[in-house]
Amino acid sequence: NCCIPAPEPAVDCKIPPDSVMKGKHGRRTQESIDRANELLDKFVKTLEGRGIKVDRPTPLKFDEKIATPDWEVEHMFGCMPSRDVIITVGKEMLEATMSFRCRWFEYLAYRPLLQKYFIEDPGMRHETAPKPRLTDKDYHMNYLSEDVSIEQRLKWAEKKYFVTTEEEPLFDAADILRFGKDLIVQHGFTTNLKGIDWLTRHFPDHRIHTVNFPGDPYPIHIDATFTPIRPGLILNNPVRKLPQEQRKLFEDNGWEIVYAAQPAHNSPPDLSYYSVWLSMNVLVLDPCLLYTSDAADD
């Protein structure tokens, strides 16, 4: 039941004016859903073949209307990667606030697994961040204008002016990278400064470092921008470079930052929210083995 999201403040600003997704929303085609499930099933078998136990979320009725006392949207998004919704730090699994209305209830797909882990492991901690109301006060509505050029969006990104306001704490788990006792958090569309402040208070035994990438006019999640692939080595998107003053933290601690190769594709698939830089979104199994999509350059 995966869907193309209906219009809402956090979603609209992500869709470029020339995208074929403009004006389209609703349940994705059965063909695309079946193909995605086929790829997922194949990947699960690959991981299980390496002795890895794979747990999968419980689907919801993503194509039905959802609402809170403050808003309603025609349907949900779908069940995206668990790392969007949940950040695991030691024995704790923390549900993020999320910043898209269509993803507000997505955590429910993972609740059966979280309950299972809680029962099986006496040391497991299941935590949830305060759910935001996501009223219009949470968004800069001028971000919705189709008249805003990419050049203007880049200027806004450089000034750290994003679609989300500081009305209440907001963060997606996919904006967080874990480096032992250091957590790197991207400030952008889906995580605001109040969200980073909340994380700082919640993890007092960790050091929280805020980063941003001025070259990204749509800064949603850090995975296709800044990716650690083994101890001491990080891939950085050459279009979304980490500012020089923020590189110092990594370089002073022995981390080399290298720019990723150009993706094999020049444009993302139709009806896709992802950029060609999805090639950087890899799964690292160990320091010598990682999995990437076919968007990567050989």
Question: Residues of each region from the PLM?
Answer:
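The feature marks the mature, well-folded catalytic cores of soluble enzymes
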Residues: 1-298
